[in-house]
Amino acid sequence: ELGFIFQDFNLLDTLTAYENIALALSIQNISAKKIDERIRKIAKELNITEILEKYPYQMSGGQKQRVASARAIITNPKLVLADEPTGALDSKSSKMLLEQFEHLNKTINTTILMVTHDAFTASYATRVIFIKDGKIFNEIHKGTDTRKKFFDKIIDVVTLLGGDLNDAL
């Protein structure tokens, strides 16, 4: 019911990418065939099929982040806690992961609680809470806005507050 995406990946070094992802399913009494099907599907969606047999030391930071993300969302959790989930990703990989988050949210109503300093990443949310010095100082909702319009609102709030993005999101 709960998925975690850590900023520093937390993959097990002695397991392949495939095995790291499978860990989340292996405790759920799911058949090996179903586990394999789900891993292959998420691997394709996050563009990690070619690294499934690699160990973490053989992967780039972005690949590790995508494997860790796959492990967190493969169980279709009701809540995903994500700490800078796109921090180690290039723009293409970030978009793929954020689209997966959107898909989970829309299809099975998964809540994604994400910490980010990136306005682009935040623009995929339906609600953004700005925290400064440990206190909530603003909140905006996407509503019916397009992602571009919501992105512009995020930038406007940061600009109005007189800080840079690293201070506000």
Could you say what each language-model-derived stretch is?
Residues 164-165:
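Short, charged, intrinsically disordered terminal tails
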Residues 1-130:
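ABC family nucleotide-binding domain
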Residues 135-160:
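Conserved beta-strand-loop-alpha-helix hinge in the C-terminal portion
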